[in-house]
């Protein structure tokens, strides 16, 4: 679903948009996905599931609040005690650098003069393929060397892969557009590989943290902690670009990764294995 969504909706959408216009391109993409959804809806049976007793928020609001939110939060504190602050801070800062840069990537490509087809092929088609490779690499490296050291190297790579964008911005003054496009392939390759690798490490980390008793609630809360604040902060990225330019913006995005590097180094050296067991 995700691969199809990126490769078809974005790659094909960009290519069609650059040739027949975005209104027709979006209509074609929507019709294809609608047709597939209807086909799957009627052809695939519902999986068997165990129906569990549900506590209604209206009939038992106090018990619902306790079971749904209070107990999962208290469980985290009971299991990690003094380390819970380190845990939450690491999750908060871990993807901040990458997510802060994300909203301004597409405006940057357009300002550099890349066409819709070039952006689609490099950032979406090639980028998604490299991300998948990064996912597998992350799984293999975590299995081979352990989680803590990969958390640290993931934080380092997340910050460092923002720096090539500084040089790509410098190439914007180059009169030869071939240099820009070639370096874009390299930048996207490094950045998307890191995203896949770091995504695997982050999912493994959070999966180790959550308790089997409160898996859904704790996982949702921790993922929320790691994504929503950075998304909100990312809303200021456009103002930073307008005020300081892309060069300083990419340096700021890199600097936002420093807290994650420090926190992950502490986790690595103290051998703090967050495990639900």
Question: How would you describe each model-predicted region?
Answer:
Residues 103-120:
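Short amphipathic helix-loop junctions that connect adjacent transmembrane helices
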Residues 156-177:
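C-terminal ends and interior cores of transmembrane alpha-helices
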Residues 4-42:
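Helix-loop-helix hairpin linking two adjacent transmembrane segments in secondary transporters
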Residues 31-52, 263-268:
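C-terminal membrane-cytosol helix-exit motif in multi-pass small-molecule transporters
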Residues 116-118, 212-222:
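Loop-to-transmembrane helix entry/capping segments in MFS-fold secondary transporters
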Residues 1-17, 223-234:
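Glycine-rich segments within core transmembrane alpha-helices of 12-TM secondary carriers
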Residues 48-86:
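Juxtamembrane intracellular "pre-TM" segments in multi-pass secondary transporters
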Residues 17, 133-150, 241-242:
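Helix-to-loop junctions at the C-terminal end of transmembrane segments
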């Amino acid at each position: 679903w995700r691969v199809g969504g990126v490769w078809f909706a974005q790659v094909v959408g960009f290519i069609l948009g650059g040739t027949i216009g975005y209104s027709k391109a979006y209509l074609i993409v929507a019709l294809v996905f609608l047709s597939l959804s209807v086909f799957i809806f009627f052809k695939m049976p519902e999986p068997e599931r165990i129906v569990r007793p549900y506590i209604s928020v209206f009939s038992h609001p106090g018990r619902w609040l306790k079971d749904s939110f209070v107990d999962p939060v208290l469980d985290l504190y009971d299991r990690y005690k003094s380390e819970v602050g380190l845990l939450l801070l690491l999750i908060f800062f871990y993807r901040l650098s990458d997510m802060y840069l994300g909203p301004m990537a597409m405006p940057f490509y357009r300002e550099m003069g890349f066409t819709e087809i070039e952006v689609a092929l490099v950032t979406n088609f090639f980028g998604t393929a490299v991300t998948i490779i990064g996912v597998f690499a992350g799984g293999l490296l975590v299995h081979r060397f352990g989680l803590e050291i990969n958390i640290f190297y993931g934080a380092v790579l997340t910050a460092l892969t923002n720096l090539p964008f500084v040089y790509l911005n410098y190439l914007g003054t180059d009169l030869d557009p071939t240099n820009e496009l070639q370096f874009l392939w390299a930048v996207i390759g490094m950045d998307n590989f890191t995203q896949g690798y770091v995504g695997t490490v982050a999912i493994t980390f959070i999966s180790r943290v959550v308790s089997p008793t409160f898996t859904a609630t704790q996982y949702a809360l921790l993922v929320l902690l790691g994504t929503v604040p950075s998304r909100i902060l990312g809303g200021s990225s456009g103002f930073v670009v307008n005020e300081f330019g892309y060069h300083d913006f990419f340096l700021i995005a890199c600097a936002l990764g420093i807290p994650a590097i420090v926190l992950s180094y502490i986790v690595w050296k103290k051998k703090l294995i967050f495990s639900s067991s």
